[in-house]
Curated annotation (Swiss-Prot):
Belongs to the KdsB family. The keyword Transferase applies. GO terms for cellular component: cytosol. Its EC number is 2.7.7.38. Keywords: Cytoplasm, Lipopolysaccharide biosynthesis, Nucleotidyltransferase, Transferase. It catalyses: 3-deoxy-alpha-D-manno-oct-2-ulosonate + CTP = CMP-3-deoxy-beta-D-manno-octulosonate + diphosphate. This is 3-deoxy-manno-octulosonate cytidylyltransferase. Pathway: Nucleotide-sugar biosynthesis; CMP-3-deoxy-D-manno-octulosonate biosynthesis; CMP-3-deoxy-D-manno-octulosonate from 3-deoxy-D-manno-octulosonate and CTP: step 1/1; Bacterial outer membrane biogenesis; lipopolysaccharide biosynthesis. It is found in: Cytoplasm. The gene is kdsB. One of its GO terms (molecular function) is 3-deoxy-manno-octulosonate cytidylyltransferase activity. It comes from Haemophilus influenzae (strain PittGG).
Amino acid sequence: MSFTVIIPARFASSRLPGKPLADIAGKPMIQHVFEKALQSGANRVIIATDNENVADVVKNFGAEVCMTSVNHNSGTERLAEVVEKLAIPDNEIIVNIQGDEPLIPPVIVRQVADNLAKFNVNMASLAVKIHDGEELFNPNAVKVLTDKDGYVLYFSRSVIPYDRDQFMNLQDVQKVQLADAYLRHIGIYAYRSGFIKQYMQWAPTQLENLEKLEQLRVLYNGERIHVELAKEVPAVGVDTAEDLEKVRLILAKD
């Protein structure tokens, strides 16, 4: 099975400007992400950026680059531009990896592509089990609820499902007894290329605007998303300077 990885690499991050070029163990961060994508077995890896400096660095380490607009409001809009510019066939599987995930396990990149190929859906993703109450109640940890076959019922920053008997008078989140139903969504997606174009035809929905989760547009419009448990839990991504230092320490040991 062939699949293409697209890695968006925005230069103007509000919390960590220029992070695609941040040095980690002697390489720019975006090169680490690119190398992980190659290790997944992808037949093509494309880095999508809106910055000429990033594009020059990417070309220097031998990766394919696609220049995109600076005006996109979401990562999906950037993917759609790449798909259109490069005339990627509608049936091609596209895996979207964030450009700030230098520690992403290659095995889960392959897994999400396989997940899409196995099921009659246009979009697939992964999740991991939630093991502590702090993560469960953290709005930055997106929860996902599925049916018995792994098809998504809903994504939320709130706790879903809500355990009425346990949570109603909860005093200490550390004392929560967690059921297997509690899953944290991992922000890695696989799509059919043509579906990305279809997605762009739908107007933003109230649900996604409230939760700030663009994948809810897919559910709202009646499409299904399949989610599997990730074979490996990904390590920290890089959103802040503190995250960057953590990743540098991890890769310095390798």
